[in-house]
Amino acid sequence: MSSLAAAHATNAVNALLQSVLPGSASVNAERKKTSRDKGSKAQLIDRNLKKRVEVQEKDVYRIKKREKKMLRKKISGRKEVQEDIEQKAKLQVLRKHQVDNSLTDHEKSYLDKVVKKNVRNLKSWDYDDKEELLDLQKQILANSEDSKKVRKVKSRRQKKKQFKEKLPQSIQDHRYKALTPGLAPVGASDEEESEDEDEDY
C-alpha cells in the first residue's frame, strides 16, 4: 500500500471515528509500533551494556582527574618544602658570611630584599590584626549597648514586681467594698436617700 493510500485510509477512519465518537483520539498512520521502537531483548541488553560502559568511562575519567589533582598537590607541597629548605640554607650561609664580614655586594642586596619582604609581611599582618581588633571592638560595643538596654528593661520590670509584692493586700486593692462603681452604697437606692433628705427638712 502506498503512503498516499495509507493517508487517505487514515483520514477516512479518523472522520468516521469523529462522527461516531466525538472527542475520541485520532489514528496516526506514521506512528510506529512500540515493539519496533524497543527492539528485541538482545538489542535492549546491548543498549544497556553500552550505557553502562559510558558511565564507567566517565567514572574512570573522574577518578583519573582526581588522582592527577592530588598528585599535583603533593608535587607542589614537595616543591614548597624544597624551596623552604634551600632558603634556610642560603640564609645560614649568609649569616656566616655576615659574622665573618665577608659579604659580597650580591649577598648584601639579597639580604636587603629578604629583610624588606619580611618587614612587608609583618606590616600586613599587623594591619590585618588591627582590622580584626577594630571589628571585634565594634561587635563588643554593639553587644554591650544591646545588653544594657535589655538589663534596664529587666531591672524596671523587677522593681515594679518587687514594689507590688511589698505592698499590703489592703493597699493593693484600692476599691472600696461598700461602694458600687457609681459611688452609691450597696443596697441603697436613690429613692431612700431622697426620703431621708425630705424628713430632715
From Swiss-Prot:
Region (Disordered), start-end ranges: 24-43, 147-201
Keyword DNA-binding: no
Biased composition (Basic residues): 149-163
Record InterPro entries: Rrt14 (IPR031404)
Compositionally biased residues, Acidic residues: 189-201
A cellular component term, taken from the record's GO annotations: nucleolus
Keywords for the protein's UniProt record, in alphabetical order: Nucleus, Transcription, Transcription regulation
Subcellular location: Nucleus, Nucleolus
Biased composition (Basic and acidic residues): 29-40, 164-176
Pfam families: RRT14
Function comment: Involved in ribosome biogenesis, probably through modulation of rDNA transcription.
Family per record: Belongs to the RRT14 family.
Protein name: Regulator of rDNA transcription 14
